[in-house]
Structure formats: C-alpha cells, structure tokens
A protein has these predicted regions:
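Short alpha-helical scaffold segments that flank and stabilize functional sites
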Residues: 15, 38, 64, 73-77, ...
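Hydrophobic face of alpha-helices
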Residues: 6, 36-39, 112
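Conserved AMP-binding/adenylate-forming core of the ANL superfamily
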Residues: 18-64, 68-72, 89-94
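Structural core segment of the AMP-binding/adenylate-forming
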Residues: 48-49, 76-132
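Generic structural signal for beta-strand residues in well-ordered domains
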Residues: 13-15, 50-52, 119
C-alpha cells in the first residue's frame, strides 16, 4: 500500500470521525467528520466549476478553520493551492492571483473588500472564506 499525504488525511478522518479536528478562535469545533463533509462539498463546487487536476486555487485570509479545510480540499482534489499572506497589500495580492492564473480565489471579507476586482481577469469564482 502506498502511503502519502492524502492517505494519512483520509486515514485520520476515518479513525477519528467523531473526534475534534479543528477549533476556531470563537471556540467552534469541527469534528473530523465535519471536515470531511466540508471537503466533499468543496470538491463538488470544484467539479461544477470545471476545475481539473493541476488548476490553481488561491487562498488569502487570516488564519481560520475554513482556510485549513479549503487547503485540504484543494490538495485532495488534485488542484494546486496558491496560499497568499493576508498581510500583503491589495496590489500584491492581485498580482499573485493574476500571475498564478488562479481560477478560484478564497478570500477573507476584509481582503476581498480591498481588492479592485476589475483588475483581476481571473479568478472565475470568488468564495468568501467565512461564507462556506
């Protein structure tokens, strides 16, 4: 049996399904099962958006549980995660998103509000990190 990163994620989810996996700063806890359900929903979104193996998906927000879940969903789908520090200025974030050709952008609300959307021909889809 080949063991790799995804194997360990799947294995951990299966054996710890009901146990806490992630807790946010407000104290809301997600079990491994919750994480698996969120990942599955994001996989459906990626599929409906036409995302294929190797396509880039950018993430830019403060640390939060949804960031971690989105990151795991991207990797387990076979897409390429493009993590962007939320401390970057809006023009730098736009440049990274444009240069990477990210097809989807997960963005925290404060970051999304600062970006000039018309200067980003891609991404095709933007998801507010707090909303999924």
């Amino acid at each position: 049996m080949e063991e790799n990163f995804l194997y360990y994620i799947e294995h951990s989810i299966r054996i710890h399904w009901e146990e806490p996996a992630l807790t946010d700063y407000q104290g809301q806890t997600h079990t491994f099962g919750d994480v698996a359900h969120h990942i599955a929903r994001l996989h459906l979104l990626f599929e409906e958006s036409g995302i294929r193996r190797g396509d880039k998906i950018a993430l830019c927000s403060r640390n939060q549980t949804n960031w971690g879940i989105a990151f795991l969903a991207i990797l387990s789908y076979g897409a390429v995660a493009v993590p962007i520090l939320h401390e970057f200025k809006a023009d730098n974030i736009r440049h990274i998103v444009n240069h990477s050709e990210a097809r989807i952008l997960f963005a925290g609300t404060p970051i999304w509000e600062e970006l000039q959307k018309e200067e980003m021909p891609k991404p095709e889809t933007v998801i507010k990190m707090e909303d999924y």
